[in-house]
Regions:
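Hydrophobic transmembrane alpha-helical segments in integral membrane proteins
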Residues: 1-19
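Membrane-proximal helix-loop-helix units in multi-pass membrane proteins
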Residues: 53-101
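Juxtamembrane "helix-exit" motif on the non-cytosolic side of transmembrane helices
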Residues: 26-29, 56-65, 117-125
Length: 170
């Protein structure tokens, strides 16, 4: 494995650890006491910025040697995810809201995991990302962690106060 890839994966590992700590200590304790729509809203707003993935298509931001198969897949997957996040925000408090959030989060997670799969198969080297290096090393770990929070909210969300009340009644 080339040394630049070691630094790349080490950067990603540190981001996963740091964002995991932030999520566990600051984000989840705040979200878990909110109603489902209120808990999902800030996470969906964050994901509406996934259009940043288009940076891999901008000449001069990335190396001309960046494999096009990887670049187009990652960029368009992110644009679709950003669009679904915005649609989820618009419909969140409607009858279709939760279903659209499920679609968004399934797509968004699959898109990020697909990029992890596509990168080595397309022959991507970390240096080819140029200025977009921060996307997989800083942003993607945050996005994956927040997808985990979204799934947790969708699967089990009940505000902490309601959980405490139900325990007292039992």
């Amino acid at each position: 494995m080339p040394q630049q890839m070691i630094w790349f994966f080490l950067s990603m590992a540190f981001s996963f650890i740091a964002w995991g700590i932030v999520a566990a200590r600051y984000i989840w304790p705040e979200l878990r006491v909110r109603q489902r729509a209120e808990a999902l809203e800030p996470l969906l707003i964050l994901h509406s910025f996934r259009f940043i993935g288009l940076a891999v298509l901008v000449p001069g931001v990335v190396s001309p040697e960046l494999p096009p198969a990887f670049a187009y897949s990652a960029a368009y997957g992110d644009v679709i995810a950003a669009t679904l996040a915005l649609l989820s925000l618009l419909l969140l408090r409607s009858a279709a809201g939760v279903a659209v959030v499920w679609i968004f989060s399934l797509w968004g997670t699959a898109d990020l995991l697909n990029s992890f799969y596509q990168a080595p198969h397309a022959g991507l080297l970390a240096g080819q990302l140029g200025a977009a290096f921060f996307i997989p090393t800083f942003v993607v770990p945050l996005l994956l962690i927040t997808h985990g929070l979204i799934f947790r909210i969708l699967l089990q969300h009940q505000p902490a106060s309601a959980m405490q009340e139900s325990r007292h009644l039992a």
